[in-house]
Amino acid sequence: ALPIFLDLLVNIFPLQGDRVVIPSDILSNSENGVDTNERGRKELEQYGLDKYFDFPKPTSLISYLANMVTYDSKDNIILDFFSGSGTTAEAIMINNQEYSSNNKFILVQLPEVLDVNSDGYKDGYRTIPEIAEKRIDLAGDKIIAENPLLGGQLDIGFKVFELDKSNVKKRNTEAQDIVQHLEFIEDNFEQNSTPLDVVYEIML
């Protein structure tokens, strides 16, 4: 029998009401309200952070992409594996404010160390994520200041996790001493670990 090869292309498009919306292949301000990197720089400028990034993404880009896949759902998690300046966080908070949604974000960024001669280093920052944290803080405060009626309804808080050594002790599998095995079973967490550290490590 001859093998049969199927070349399947699956497209997933969002529904708006009872109709399918096919996103445009071209992202532009006139087509779908998406700005350029120049606008991204101006957004950082209002926080005094524009000199640290050459080509920051505008929040309108992330907002458009997020809305494209979360149109009728208000409790999603948006994951950004190359978070850079933290645009995704600000865009999701803006969307939550505009559409009364409760979307959350997870930003992942390597702790890229700043050059000692860079503006960011001279201003006290040591890594890219440190600048992004500042931006997210300021962006959340700005949204609340511009929308005082929201009060505590809009969640602008976030947690920061850094890659670190495990809280679980390394077990010596070659140990012959029964006492060592019993001690490990009794307390297999590092001495300086807190209950919260352990819970988060197990969760993540």
Label for each model-derived stretch:
Residues 8-17, 93-96, 140-150, 199:
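Intrinsically disordered, low-complexity boundary segments flanking structured domains
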Residues 26, 105-107, 160:
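Conserved beta-strand scaffold positions in the cores of enzyme catalytic domains, especially
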Residues 62-142:
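Conserved S-adenosyl-L-methionine
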Residues 39-44, 106-117, 176-183, 203:
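Short acidic (Asp/Glu) and glycine-rich catalytic loops that position anionic groups and cofactors
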Residues 118, 122-204:
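SAM-dependent methyltransferase catalytic region
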